[in-house]
Amino acid sequence: HPFNAVYSVGDQVKVEWKGSWWDAIIIESNGENHLIHYSGFESSWDEWVTAERIQKPN
């Protein structure tokens, strides 16, 4: 997918983790990196990811 995709706080996205794509929401962003929360998981799983690991859901 294009690396110039723009993601915003509150966006519902898919995030790649160990070869699988998981539902997540962006809860913070600093431009290059995004803090995501995996839907249905505790906040201890929240992590900063680069745009390469994010895609918009179909």
Residue ranges of predicted features:
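Eukaryotic chromatin- and chromosome-associated nuclear factors
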Residues: 1-58
